[in-house]
Amino acid sequence: MPDLLLELFSEEIPARMQARAREDLKKLVTDGLVEAGLTYAGAGVFSTPRRLVLAIEGLSGESRAVREERKGPKSDAPEAAIEGFLRSTGLSRDQLELRDDKKGQVFFAVFERPGRAAPAIVAEVVESVIRNFPWPKSMRWGSGSLRWVRPLQSILCILGDEGSAEIVPVTVDRLTASNTTCGHRFLAPARFPVSSFDDYTAKLRRAFVMLDSAEREAHIWNDATNQAFANGLEVVPDAGLLTEVAGLVEWPVVLLGKIGEAFLGLPPEVLQTSMREHQKFFSVRAKSGRIEGFVTVANTVTKDHGATILAGNQKVLSARLSDAKFFWENDVAVAKAGMADWADGLKSVTFHNKLGSQFDRIERIAALAAEIAPLVGADAVEAALAARTAKLDLRSSMVGEFPELQGKMGRYYAAEAGLSPAVANAARDHYAPLGPSDAVPSDPVSVAVALADKIDTLTGFWAIDEKPTGSKDPFALRQMGRASCRERVLLMG
């Protein structure tokens, strides 16, 4: 039984689209082959930034011959009914069979469909899949009609069996399938032929391409952690970033760098978020927990072992962190002045056109937190103060740049303003839990503010008839309801 190897080679595929594209390619091709009458033993799918690859083992050489029967009208039925049956089947009357039935003789149409060779079926299925591939975003280029996520440059499609390989005659616009591909864009750009999946993967590795994304992830993580350990440091785990970076490189080369002394005083969340979002760097911390370095992943091998790449990355990182330091210092100055400017600024920020501004909402939450405080063992005055402070960081420069830091920065700013640890922690913890695995706040002040925040949101949206429906919940009210239930259950012991 032959094995199928399909490679769709293009310009860089966005990392965020690769996992879905792998699954779509596998499902669409295998479903199409099975629907056409072929069977297979197994299928694997792979991706790099420049290629989607499908390998199918044990594909049947041809589809089975099929005999189909279709029951028609009785022999004494009106002529119009018989003519309609003939038109629908495309047969003439003398091609129909008469068979005895309980109600008399009935016409039957019999179709004999011979088996088809696998190459012809594969060519049809692959062409259809390429033309109708469900990319979230796609583009056209040149004068052709084909749409792809980035310009599709070549198609490799072969059926191999016992050492021989046959090129499948796939043609899409001006692209015709071949048995050749190429390696790394810079390290091995020349094209070369392949005869099987094993031959393909071996030659790609010699051409500086690591085909399996899981292997690239493991290589990046192992090399990064080993380099950090050798320097008495550790890499901050980040599974999402690891997957993304593995989708940006074909031949990962891990480089360990240092953060400039001028930026080591920034909060670790700021350093980590800035490096992750802007540079796709992993954060590296000392045993004390302070972030002191970073890991970047290059896509090439250099004669100076990455020194030039690392120097360039450190220069860009310094510029990014200079911005973050500027935001931090300005925000700290506002915090030490009492954060009144931020509170006034929230008066012009609409929470919902039927529920007022963020300032109005904060006042409601503060009043409610003061009512809840005695029930959870918190001081009412402190709970109200925490509620009025918790969302002020929404007007800060840092949260404006990195919205995901809301609450976390609020804790730092409350501390800089000289407020109590309970008030500062409430700024960070009142958003929790954000998911089923998140911890529920335990400090009484944080619990009072967290419950008040969620209750105000839920009752407010119910009051204006913005309830979640079966398929829509734009304000995440279900999640908020579950979170408030978890908080109440915790309080009940």
Q: What is each model feature region?
A:
Residues V489-G493:
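Hydrophobic alpha-helical segments, chiefly the membrane-spanning helices
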Residues M1-R488:
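Amphipathic alpha-helical "coupling" segments that flank catalytic cores
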